[in-house]
């Protein structure tokens, strides 16, 4: 309502009052008094209205101030600069400013906006803190609600992006720790599963005892410190068990292989445990086959060892005889004579049957002796090969001597050309004998110098055999020279007799011839003259080995 309208209304009311007063007959004094009362009442109404408006103004200003303070607090909590844009006082003074109500509406809108942003920021904080709480709970294995709630209440005055970023970094660190724990859990579970497979254990039962969630391959698994410790402890325990069983199995298999070798167990009987025997030199990481270290397998191997143990005693006599025969065969091939320390077969059997000795000890002695003989045979190999060649050459030499003494050797007959070829080869070989003997003697001398004991051939010193052969060969050579000289002398005597027979009577010539023939009739090649070497020359058809046999 405008001012003119108010004045018009006030005038009409006064006129109406004047009319009534006239009709009533009120005096001027009463009229003045009533007008004063009306004016006083109007003043009071105006004053009340003014006070009320002032109070409203104060309230609006206070609300504006409170809202501004709230906005400033929210900006402070969120670490943002307060942007209010309040200029109503200066604007009002200049007469063109916004009213307090307009300012209140504006600040309330700003407050609503900031409250909304704070609420959104708070939701972000709650989400991050809740994620942190969940990860901590998984890691610690216990509820962490109280800690998280108290942390949030203490930090509610700080909802800044900086604080939110710190929480995000903390969450990332915890999530990284969680990922590492999950990987560690998975690795340990795979290791435990492999150990259970090798040891023949029930994997589900084993892992359930640690934590039931570890059985579930799709759901969430426990990654708490307690679960990690229990899982690592279980892996360590079964790994040590694997090592113990592996060592036990390898010891059992070693004994089983010894039994197999000892008793020459057929391959078909060994086939059942062939996979087990393959692990005799395996490392812990190389044993991965299921049930390869199970209790059942160990018991099976132990049962087989018990069977072999029982079988061993029944076959021990046979084994001793066999090993002894093998030793004798090795000695025969290497021309080594068994020493007195080697127990005779008859005595060995009697000792085993009486129980006075352990058959295994006897076998060990025989195998040890066989090993020593084989070791010595390696060092004797070259000399033995040369000795065999020498003995073969000696046999050819004897055959050639027999052949040369055969008066019918040049008679043509079946196979005579083959005999002539052999004689040719024998002469070539015999011509090499001196060099062969010298080389062999040199080898033997070096060998005896290195070993510091004599080289024996079937119990005889081989060097002595060579020396004896050399002496005999020289004696035979001297005998052959003596025969040639004697034959030459005999030819000269015969020639002189033939010259004198022209003047002597026929009877005298005949008597001399008979006498001469009687003198050498004992042998077509060997004269009857007593010679210091005649006894040895009769041995010319024997070999060095036969002389020392």
Curated annotation (Swiss-Prot):
It is found in: Nucleus; Cytoplasm; Cytoplasm, Cytoskeleton, Spindle pole. One of its GO terms (cellular component) is spindle pole. Pfam families: MAP65_ASE1. Belongs to the MAP65/ASE1 family. GO terms for molecular function: microtubule binding. It comes from Arabidopsis thaliana (Mouse-ear cress). This is 65-kDa microtubule-associated protein 9. Residues 36-123, 160-199, 459-492 form a coiled coil.
């Amino acid at each position: 309502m405008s001012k003119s309208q108010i004045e018009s209304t006030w005038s009409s009311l006064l006129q109406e009052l004047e009319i009534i007063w006239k009709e009533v007959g009120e005096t001027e004094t009463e009229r003045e008094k009533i007008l004063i009362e009306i004016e006083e009442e109007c003043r009071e109404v105006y004053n009340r209205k003014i006070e009320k408006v002032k109070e409203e103004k104060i309230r609006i200003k206070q609300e504006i101030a409170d809202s501004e303070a709230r906005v400033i607090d929210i900006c402070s909590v969120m670490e943002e600069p307060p942007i209010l844009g309040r200029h109503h006082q200066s604007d009002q003074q200049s007469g063109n400013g916004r009213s307090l109500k307009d300012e209140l509406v504006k600040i309330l809108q700003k407050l609503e906006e900031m409250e909304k942003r704070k609420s959104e920021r708070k939701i972000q904080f709650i989400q991050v803190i809740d994620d942190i709480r969940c990860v901590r709970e998984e890691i610690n294995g216990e509820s962490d609600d109280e800690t998280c709630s108290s942390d949030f209440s203490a930090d509610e005055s700080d909802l800044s992006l900086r604080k939110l970023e710190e929480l995000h970094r903390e969450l990332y660190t915890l999530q990284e720790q969680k990922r590492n724990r999950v990987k560690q859990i998975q690795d340990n579970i795979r290791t435990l599963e492999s150990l259970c497979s090798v040891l023949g254990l029930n994997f589900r039962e084993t892992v359930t005892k640690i934590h039931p969630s570890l059985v579930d391959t799709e759901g969430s698994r426990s990654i708490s410190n307690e679960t990690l410790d229990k899982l690592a402890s279980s892996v360590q325990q079964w790994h040590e068990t694997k090592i113990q069983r592996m060592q036990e199995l390898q010891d059992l298999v070693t004994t089983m292989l010894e039994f197999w070798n000892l008793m020459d167990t057929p391959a078909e009987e060994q086939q059942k445990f062939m996979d087990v025997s393959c692990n005799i030199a395996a490392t812990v990481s190389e044993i991965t086959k299921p049930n390869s270290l199970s209790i059942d397998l160990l018991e099976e191997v132990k049962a087989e060892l018990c069977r072999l143990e029982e079988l061993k005693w029944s076959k021990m006599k046979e084994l001793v005889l066999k090993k002894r025969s093998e030793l004798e065969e090795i000695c025969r091939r290497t021309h080594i004579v068994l020493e007195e320390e080697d127990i005779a077969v008859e005595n060995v059997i009697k000792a085993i049957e009486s129980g006075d000795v352990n058959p295994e000890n006897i076998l060990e002695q025989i195998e040890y002796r066989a090993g020593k003989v084989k070791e010595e045979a390696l060092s004797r190999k070259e000399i033995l090969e040369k000795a065999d060649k020498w003995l073969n050459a000696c046999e050819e030499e004897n055959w050639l001597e027999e052949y040369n003494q055969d008066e019918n050797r040049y008679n043509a007959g079946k196979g005579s050309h083959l005999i002539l070829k052999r004689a040719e080869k024998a002469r070539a070989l015999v011509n090499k004998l001196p060099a062969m003997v010298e080389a062999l003697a040199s080898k033997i001398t070096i060998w005896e110098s290195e070993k510091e004991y004599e080289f024996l051939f079937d119990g005889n010193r081989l060097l002595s055999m060579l020396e004896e052969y050399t002496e005999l060969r020289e004696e035979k050579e001297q005998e052959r020279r003596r025969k040639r000289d004697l034959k030459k002398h005999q030819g000269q005597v015969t020639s002189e007799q033939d010259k004198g027979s022209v003047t002597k009577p026929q009877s005298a010539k005949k008597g001399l011839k008979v006498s001469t023939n009687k003198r050498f009739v004992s042998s077509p090649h060997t004269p009857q003259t007593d010679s210091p070497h005649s006894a040895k020359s009769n041995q010319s058809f024997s070999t060095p080995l036969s002389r020392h046999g």
